[in-house]
Amino acid sequence: SIPASLGLRIGSNEIVNALFGYGSFSEENILMTSEALKFFGYGVPAFALIKILSNLFFSRSNTITPFKISVFIVLINILISLSLFKSIGFIIIPIATSISTWLGVIVYFILLKKNKSLFINKILLKNILKIVFSAILMASVLLLGLDVFQEDLDYANKFKSIYLLFIVSFVATIYLISCYLLGVLKIKNYKIK
């Protein structure tokens, strides 16, 4: 989720432009949509963590706590959105979604810590740091790629989707190779038995 988050935040404009930048979907529409996508990007790691942390409760046959936290997230989301929609506009919706989801993650961590159900060892921390490093490397290459192919990704270019696909494929490969070299990704774990 970390590389996905960085990718959305860095390349949101190019992604929306490549997918929807045709016909009646104007450059202004692209800018507005890409801004929303960028703010959703901040919440991507939280969305993934919510899924993982809720399973820790489900595995103990506790479905009430995740339900309560889900309600809490929805209420916070609605509260923030309604409070600031008039002053900020539609962009508050992805912002509120990301903020409320991160607050939900914090609640999960507090409850798991309180119940002594959260165990984070040194190996896990090392792997997280390695993933962060690989994601930063990927993001750097992505920034470079978007800069080099800036003209090819222009709104008027009919083949912009192909160029974006090439860039995304390349940076994804860089990320996977980095994870493999750092020992996070092990091929033996994916061998078909």
Where are the regions a protein language model picked out?
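Membrane-embedded alpha-helical bundles of multi-pass transporters/translocases
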Residues: S1-K193
